[in-house]
Amino acid sequence: MDQTFEKRKKVIYDFICDDFYIPMKVKEIATVLQVSKEQRRELQEVLDALVEEGKITLSKRGKYSKGQAKRITGTFQANIRGFGFVMVEGEDEDIFIPGENVNGAFQGDEVECIITGAPGGKRKEGKIVRIVSHQVKKIVGLYEKSKSFGFVRPDNQRYLKDIYIPAGKEMDAMDGHKVVVELTSYGQEHAKPEGKIVEIIGHVNDPGADILSIVKDYDLPTEFPEKVLNQAVRVGKDVSEADCAGRLDLRDWQMVTIDGEDAKDLDDAVSLTMKDENYQLGVHIADVTNYVQEKSALDREALKRGTSVYLADRVIPMLPHVLSNGICSLNAGEDRLALSCIMTVSPKGEVIDHQIAETVIRVDKRMSYTGVSKVLAEEPEALKEDEDFVPMIQKMQELSTILRERRGKRGSIDFDFPETKIELDEKGKPINIKPYERNSATKIIEDFMLLANETVAEEYFWREVPFLYRTHEVPDEEKIKKLSTFINNFGYHIHVHDEVKPKEIQKLLSQVEGTPEEALISRLTLRSMCQAKYTLENTGHFGLAAKYYTHFTSPIRRYPDLQIHRIIKENLRGRLNENRIEHYDKILPEVAKQCSDRERLAEETEREVVKMKKAEYMRMHIGEEYEGVISGVTKWGIYVELPNTVEGLVHVVDLRDDHYNFIEQTYEMVGEHTGKTYKLGEKVRVRVSDADKLLRTINFELA
């Protein structure tokens, strides 16, 4: 909308807000303001816009009055520059809050705001009118001591003010300590928040203090309660013959685990034999529920955590290590209890028969992704070392290829963004950063786990019992329209009828593969997708193009898997009666929400640790030059990604050879005088100019 329209809105709004105004119909307003017949349509549009913004109301009799602004409740997200946003649950678009309208709101507060406008048809603007509740109780930061008091500088830059620590509330913290501070006052516009120190994490330079600070900032648990540890220790260390009673005995089946070299919690093993022309694939999952009883201290703590969190220097496990690395881990040469999904798969990759059973297994060998990929590459040493397993591994790759092709044909989407592997020295300093290798061995396990998850989900969908599904909804229509408009600038199209199909997204990603705009379009496409979550209703998984999907294969590190194992075992034992069904109907909605929330929190924590360690690593390489690729272009600069997955920003002010303008349609920077362009996918040489570990930012300049 243009400026003229906005000015007219202001004139009409001021008129209706006048103390002498009485409610009028559109014709009456037109008469009083001497609006010509030709302009009445625009007057109606102005009135409609003001009604939509909540500034005025329209009565049943067609009269306009000053509106009682509708109050919207949401969560305040502060910005380092003083403004912020209110995020409203269920709404895709946040409400922008200018600095002068923040009204003392604190990062994370639950607030009420009113809409003040949507200038130029852009995002809604608002004003905070009430702080409903302060959600943040504790903050992590750096303690700075003075003679009679101290301050804590928050690590999270969204907390815009330092926290004042009065004398006697510092818990003997010293200058340079990383601390947790409990807020006692949230401050005023011109007064700092106050607090007391409740935990000293360690000195800022202590190994691991940086990652532990992020862990504390996200309020992740670092210790297990004593009751939980005691319960874990009491669990037996061996599988007895009594434990095996009534179970399908698969100890003579050839099977292996395939994991990363440093993995300790091995919760899945695989077996494969041929049955005529069909494959008999066994996916054998640790029977954790045998040791974690429902409603026990162990179970309550596992649900509270929801998931294990994998960070650069540590794992925050869902279950105590004595269980996750002990009796629950499918260690080679030891009897273990499992829940197995044994599938007969046709040469076309179709599951034509399956059995889910409680089993006892004995893994023959612990193998690594690296070792298996060497076998598949037919390296002589690897073939000799693993000669007993070579035929099975080769058949596994054969089946993996069939399954992957079958998923591809139905429209399964693979974004294939490289994950980052960070190597640390003994002091916690990053010494190397590189992309995680995704090889043929990782794909085998991925394909087999996906198949087991789909098979289990389909069986329990048709059984019509309470269950947890892993669902991924069809993308929002508006988001896909925006994506479609954007990719048209590059000559790509998405065919959307009633709703977009996975095949259309898959086709787009295939078309952009290897092009300069691949990274940007892939990222924007990913952002157009919904987030996967846990639900009781099976609505399918859009990204996998799967009608049925669940999480069955990782009960050591994910609570939803543990939860469905319980339901499956009760069903296998004939104990899933009306009372138990009623019980699951009652508890599963909260379990689904808790697990979805904890998963998002874990992902955010993992992401922040990676960003921090990348900045710390590049800080040690300031002045060095690298080859990179332009991965993003914005009005404030160009983003360049290095082969090691590190991404940094070349600020537009550092493009000194010309004045550059951002062309939004094609995501280019164009020099006004030289006509020089910087485009997506273009190779550039950059020099590291700055890296800030606290802000987790990296800056480059063109070399």
Question: Where are the language model's segments positioned?
Answer:
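Short beta-strand-to-coil "C-cap" segments at the C-terminal boundary of structured domains/repeats
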Residues: I201, E701-A703
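Charge-lined substrate channels and their catalytic hotspots, especially those that engage the 3′ end
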Residues: M1-G282, T289-D335, G371-K374, Y667-M669, ...
